[in-house]
Amino acid sequence: NSELINSILGLPKVMNEA
């Protein structure tokens, strides 16, 4: 599932923006 991969790969990005 692309959404699952996007969630895992996007997690560091969200934490970096936080």
From Swiss-Prot:
The main location is: secreted
* Name of the protein in question: Pigment-dispersing hormone
Does the keyword Hydrolase feature in the UniProt annotation?
A: no
Pfam families recorded for this chain? Pigment_DH
**InterPro entries annotated for this entry?**
Pigment_DH
Q: Which GO terms describe its cellular component?
A: extracellular region; synapse
Keywords from the named record? Amidation, Hormone, Neurotransmitter, Secreted
Signal peptide range equals none
Q: Which family does it belong to?
A: Belongs to the arthropod PDH family.
Identify the species of origin: Procambarus clarkii
Q: What does this protein do?
A: Causes the migration of the distal retinal pigment into the proximal end of the pigment chromatophore cells and thus decreases the amount of light entering the retinulas. May also function as a neurotransmitter and/or neuromodulator.
For this entry, list what GO says about its biological process: chemical synaptic transmission; response to light stimulus
Q: Does the keyword Secreted apply?
A: yes
Q: Which domain of life is it from?
A: Eukaryota
* A GO molecular function held by the record: hormone activity
- Alanine amide-modified residues are 18
Location in the cell reads: Secreted
